[in-house]
Amino acid sequence: MKYSIIVPVFNRPDEVDELLESLLSQEEKDFEVIIVEDGSQIPCKEVCDKYADRLDLHYYNKDNSGPGQSRNYGAERAKGEYLLILDSDVVLPKGYIRAVSEELKREPADAFGGPDCAHDSFTDTQKAISYSMTSFFTTGGIRGGKKKLDKFYPR
């Protein structure tokens, strides 16, 4: 398996539904999805069950420990060669997995990231929030690739 898509979730079943729907539209299917429910009072298990026969989907429910620990929990259970860590509110565009694969063939990498963008279906309010969270003017260019911080040195 090439990719393990790890998604920590806290009280966001509607977002998970949209994310899983966007994963169905991917042409490249060499991935598993690991949903880590982080102590939610509004679980997304029923949403995950809807997709269980169409995606290689693994659902885990654990006590609340925050998104970082939940990402690690998912990573410990992942089988993929690469880990793609997404937030529950992500909607992937069609062709995303294929584009990642092509870029990794062209330029192998141990880690990568990218800018956020507002989906066409977003309301004006959602677009404004997205802009305030990702704009060069509000983040100083740290997000979106405008400013290179430094070389990464693993410990």
Indicate residue ranges for each PLM-predicted region.
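N-proximal low-complexity "stem/linker" segments adjacent to membrane-targeting elements
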Residues: 1-25
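A structural helix-start
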Residues: 9-17, 37, 41, 93-94
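Acidic donor-binding segment of Leloir-type glycosyltransferases
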Residues: 20-61
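The conserved acidic donor/metal-binding loop of glycosyltransferases
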Residues: 87-91
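Short, flexible, basic/aromatic active-site loop/helix in glycosyltransferases
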Residues: 114-120, 129-154
